[in-house]
Every structure is written in structure tokens, then in C-alpha cells.
Amino acid sequence: MALAVTHVLGAIFILDILRHYVFGKDKFPRYLLVIGGIAGLAPDIDFPLGWFISFVQGTSVNFHGEFTHSVLIAAIILFMGVVRHYQDDDKWAKIFYVIAAGWFIHIGFDCLFNSYETFLWPLEIQTKAFCPQKLAGFYRSGIDAI
């Protein structure tokens, strides 16, 4: 599994490349990079939620990689950006687009590091076959160290 810092910095790095070479600095302010970095970590909100539920119920609960790591949530956030775009609210459209990008980047990193098996929740389709096995095992600690 990729570490939290990899999710945050990786999302910021990828979004900054897009900012410089695709969209332009004037159309992509820096605060969006911060939002994208936070969104790159957002799918892991299931860790503290699981800890809280475990504390309240007195049992061990672990639902990491289930609903928060779904492409469906990222697609819903992307759709919210499209709706805001057509309502001529460009500021919020960009924010939703960047959150969706950070969410997709998180799922991509988790696929590369082979940390879970389903990213098409609520469908019960095992998606481990889509993720590269060799990269996940061989380069895992090296990429986190960089």
C-alpha cells in the first residue's frame, strides 16, 4: 500500500505538471494544488472512520478499500464539477474537478501498489487483474522512499 505522503505528494506532483504544461498557471491557481493534495488522501478517510466505529462498538472494524476507494465516488464528484461548469460557476467547477482528479490519482496509486481488490464498488467485480503485480511487489518501498 502506498503511504499517505505518497498519495498527497503524488497528487500534487501530477496536478502541478498538468498546471504547468496543459492548463496554464493563470487558469490553475496554486490553492487548487493544495485541494488536490488533500483530495489525494481523502479516500483513506475510512481508516479514522473504522477506528471510531471500532471504539464505539468495542469490536474491530476494517472496511479500508471498500466504498471510499470506488471510482463511482470520483465519477460523482466529477459530475458535480460538470454541473457547476454548466451553471457558470467556474471556481467551484475547478474545485470539484481537482477533487475528482485527486481521488482518481489515489485509486491509481493503490492499484499500482496492489493494496486492495475492488475499485468498482458497489459491483462485486474483483479488479486485481487490472493492477500490475510485478510493479506492486518490486518497486513498492522504493517509490514511497522517493
Regions found by a protein language model. Name each.
Residues 1-146:
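N-terminal membrane-targeting hydrophobic helices
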